[in-house]
């Protein structure tokens, strides 16, 4: 299967149910992590609409922008799909935590993935929360070209206001 979408950096792509983008995420995850991203009988629709885990992806821009956020991600971060896919991914962390986030992304780029990540994030409303046991991996197509990075987690904990 050859992808019809050559550049995920184009703004406005709706990848919610795109089977080729789903294959990129699922195959990259399985190659890197050694297990499936979704149950074998499920695909793009299940991952977007029904997965209990948050799944996010950003592109390879110099200032990466989210290109995918499933419904669990939208609920967790309080952004609509249209808001998410125009958002630079650095804005999912507060300014003091962006250097830590950058170190995480560099570690993923060097190793292909990391597991068991914990980090502080911020929702649209300003609600702060820790993501727990996140897996972050590179999106690499079948020809070895890096197309972005993705993350999944199913556990988070709100930070109590002082």
At which residue positions do the language-model features occur?
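Sensory/regulatory domains in signal-transduction proteins
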Residues: 2-8, 12, 46-162
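Short alpha-helical capping/linker elements at sensor-output junctions, especially the PAS-family N-cap
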Residues: 41-45
């Amino acid at each position: 299967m050859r992808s019809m979408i050559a550049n995920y950096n184009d703004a406005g792509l709706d990848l919610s149910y795109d089977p080729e983008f789903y294959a990129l995420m699922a195959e990259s995850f399985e190659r890197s992590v050694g297990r499936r991203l979704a149950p074998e009988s499920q695909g793009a629709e299940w991952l977007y609409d029904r997965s209990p885990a948050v799944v996010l992806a950003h592109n390879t821009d110099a200032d990466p922008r989210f290109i995918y956020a499933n419904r669990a991600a939208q609920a967790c971060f309080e952004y609509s799909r249209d808001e998410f896919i125009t958002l630079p991914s650095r804005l999912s962390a507060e300014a003091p935590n962006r250097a830590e986030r950058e170190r995480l992304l560099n570690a993923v780029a060097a190793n292909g993935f990391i597991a068991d990540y914990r980090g502080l994030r911020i929702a649209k409303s300003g609600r702060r929360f820790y993501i727990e046991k996140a897996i972050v991996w590179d999106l690499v197509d079948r020809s070895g070209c890096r197309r972005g990075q993705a993350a999944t987690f199913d556990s988070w904990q709100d930070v109590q206001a002082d």
